[in-house]
Amino acid sequence: MHLPEVMKIFLDTADTDLIRKYYGTGLIDGVTTNPTLIMKSGRDPEEVYQEIQDIGLSDISMEVVGNSNEMIEEGIRLATKFPNSCTVKVPCTPDGLLACAELATKNLIRVNVTLIFDVAQAILSAKAGATYVSPFVGRLDDNSIAGLGLIKDIDEVFRVQAVHKTRILSASVSYTHLTLPTTWLV
């Protein structure tokens, strides 16, 4: 009998106090960050990553930018510095997919491909070796496109095509009925 994998919840923030509170509940499994969130924190990115890792999380999406070579170089550097927690986050662009393939297949580094807006992008990302694909559910819903429908469609294609190494990580989830209320925090 095949048992489904347990759902994981990632917190999208660079606020280490909030991360610490939610981690203490046992409800979150990882953290995703991006340059904007890091900038809002007013801290050095690597200082934030180190603190998140020290909290105990072993899956932190650390976004890299630039052309494919720059993303590869930065991704390898981050994965070397944070070997127990780094998942390199790249955009679903031609350069991002080239970086994903290099990082994931040649360097065995976990990669989260973000900015997924359709099934074809998810398939290309999985083919490039992505650990996670991050469809922008909230942004699609904001534009009257069924974001959760996209998750279902990607999942169906991944099941039919036996894609087992790539997981779906819903991104940009902004509806209050799908987010954890801060009143749950002790």
Question: Model features per residue range: what roles?
Answer:
Residues 27-30, 82-84, 102-111, 127-133:
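Glycine-enriched alpha-helix->loop->beta-strand junction motifs that scaffold or abut catalytic
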Residues 34, 88, 125:
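Conserved, mostly hydrophobic/aromatic
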Residues 177-186:
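Single conserved hydrophobic/aromatic residue that forms the stacking wall/gate
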Residues 15-19, 25, 38-39, 43-95:
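Active-site beta->alpha loop and helix N-cap motifs at the rims of alpha/beta catalytic domains
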Residues 2-9, 83-87, 104-112, 161-170:
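Short beta-strand/loop segments at the ligand-binding rim of alpha/beta enzyme cores
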Residues 94, 110-112, 123-178:
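Catalytic alpha/beta core domains of metabolic enzymes, predominantly
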Residues 40-49, 69-71, 90-105, 119-124, ...:
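Active-site-adjacent beta->alpha loops and helix N-cap segments on the catalytic face
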